């Protein structure tokens, strides 16, 4: 099934390489070692339990980690020491935000705060990592509707700079899905600016390899071509959210629904996208760009 996506993926990577050259820097020539550790910062589309899992199972980054051969765990999991960690929090903007509690769930804890938590753990030696085999994945902006494009870009670039100052070298910055109605406007506005982040940072951070991930377009691919991936319903949610006192009774076939909650993909969709992310990472490694 994912083989059918190979042509599109190759085209996206070719476009990424071409835009890199046009921006005034050469594609990377030294491939990173195989990814053995990953740290994720983002919002509900990546949250696997740090704040609130807005769906019925793992998100795409967790499936990416699984395909890479390791487990991704919520950063607040007591058993997470020495593991790949997911700091993503549902409702997060790319900037700062202390968040708010809904019962046991935490919503809106900003990506700046997530990165600061990671930085504090590195500085206190609770976290150590090998820069040559560690990937830092940033997927944010869906909740930045009231921030300017410049603010979003500055937030993400500042967070990448912080991680770079701690020794990070390998980064992916996600483009956003433009086909999902709830987020179409902000994604369409932000994506052209997000696409320029690698060119800017690679020229300023010696040794860093910052790449775009077509994470958002991968969701769009599934949404626009559902039959290829075994998805039959791209319109209706499978269940409501219990934390908002909605009927959380699941539909009879969540594995065929693009959405599980309103505006948020099912874990079946996330698994498909996770496979695409894996192909993307491996293609970038092979090209020496990651």
Residue ranges and their predicted role:
Residues 9-17:
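Bacterial N-terminal signal peptides
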Residues 1-2, 17-19:
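Short hydrophobic/aromatic-rich beta-strand motifs
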Residues 1-9:
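Bacterial N-terminal signal peptides that target proteins for export
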Residues 22-290:
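Conserved active-site regions of diverse hydrolases
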């Amino acid at each position: 099934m994912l083989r059918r996506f190979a042509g599109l993926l190759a085209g996206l990577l070719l476009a990424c390489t071409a835009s890199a050259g046009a921006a005034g820097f050469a594609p990377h020539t030294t491939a990173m070692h195989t990814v053995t550790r990953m740290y994720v910062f983002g919002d509900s589309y990546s949250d696997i339990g740090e704040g609130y899992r807005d769906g019925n199972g793992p998100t795409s980054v967790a499936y990416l980690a699984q395909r890479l051969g390791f487990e991704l765990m919520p950063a607040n999991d007591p058993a997470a020491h020495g593991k790949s960690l997911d700091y993503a929090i549902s409702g997060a903007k790319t900037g700062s935000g202390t968040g708010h509690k809904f019962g046991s769930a935490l919503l809106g804890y900003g990506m700046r705060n997530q990165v600061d938590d990671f930085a504090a753990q590195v500085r206190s030696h609770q976290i150590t990592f090998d820069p040559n085999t560690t990937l830092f994945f940033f997927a944010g902006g869906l909740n930045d509707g009231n921030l300017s494009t410049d603010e979003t870009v500055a937030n993400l670039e500042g967070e990448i700079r912080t991680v770079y100052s701690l020794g990070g070298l390998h980064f992916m910055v996600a483009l956003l899905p433009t086909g999902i109605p709830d987020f179409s406007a902000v994604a369409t506005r932000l994506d052209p600016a997000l696409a320029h982040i690698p060119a800017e940072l690679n020229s300023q951070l010696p040794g860093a390899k910052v790449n775009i991930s077509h994470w958002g377009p991968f969701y769009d691919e599934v949404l626009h071509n559902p039959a290829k991936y075994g998805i039959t319903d791209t319109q209706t949610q499978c269940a409501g959210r219990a934390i908002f006192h909605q009927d959380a009774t699941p539909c009879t076939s969540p594995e065929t629904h693009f959405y599980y909650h309103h505006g948020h993909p099912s874990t079946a969709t996330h698994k498909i996208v996770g496979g695409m992310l894996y192909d993307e990472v491996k293609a970038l490694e092979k090209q020496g760009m990651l």
